[in-house]
Amino acid sequence: MALNHQRRTDKWWETEYSDNIHSYLQYHEVKWRMVYGARSPQIHLRPVLVKTIRSIAKTCEMSNVCVHLAVTLMDFFMDNHDLKFDTIMLVSFACLTLAAKIEEHCLKIPKLNTMQNVISKDVTNSHFRKVEMKILMFFEFNVAVPTVAHFIEFYKDHFFCDSDFYHNEFASILKDKFNRMILSYQDASLESIKLISYNPSMVAASIILTTRHTLGLVPCWTPQLRKVTGYLKKDLVQCCSLLGRNVMQHRKFVPIDEGYLSSSPGFQSPIIMASKKKRSHIDVPNIILSKRTAF
């Protein structure tokens, strides 16, 4: 017999199993995590690729979760392959379509013709499917991975505490600033290559901490947030520092609603692979299977 009083929702963070799902996501992010070396020869093109993904996602009305997943797949695939200029856009678009097939309704999955203005017109649907398959095989078909956006949605429900609303007339103003600031920091985290090496849950928790600190809420890290995220304030200091630095650069050089920040191609992640495997080369006419990098 159905329980009519139970709330029906597609949002996992609003269900009675949210704590269990969150625990699984934190386990999965560690189990899946690949080492990021910031060693792609095309890393200087990343800001353009991220902006393109976000632009297509906006046109197709995709979620922020889908965008974060697409960029995650693109980052780790690029880090292990040499890509020709006319191929790299195709790869980024394939990452977006794979992310959409996981996170979105089938009607929102973009079609190849939406990219015809930035990729070769000779690319066929058959060839595009081969590129998708190459990406899937590289990740061993494990592409449903947690991202910063997944964790943010859960942590947002625990953002405020009772002491934040001692002036009720400011509650709506505070919540509006909170929503806009969270989106701004999420965009900043998406554009920074320096945050890729951190677990998504840590980046998400750092966004919450940074937002509360920026809004002047005391304490900036509550016992409830510590319990929910599993992180102490001291665990997030370095990540918050990188996030804040990236936001300041973002505001200085790029309008906040525009898109992306060009990160330095010379940056080396604090977690570097002990031995770098030879990257395989992917070309438009020929697709060569690559081995997954050992880590």
Over which residues does each language-model region extend?
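Acidic, serine/threonine-rich low-complexity regulatory regions at protein termini
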Residues: M1-F295
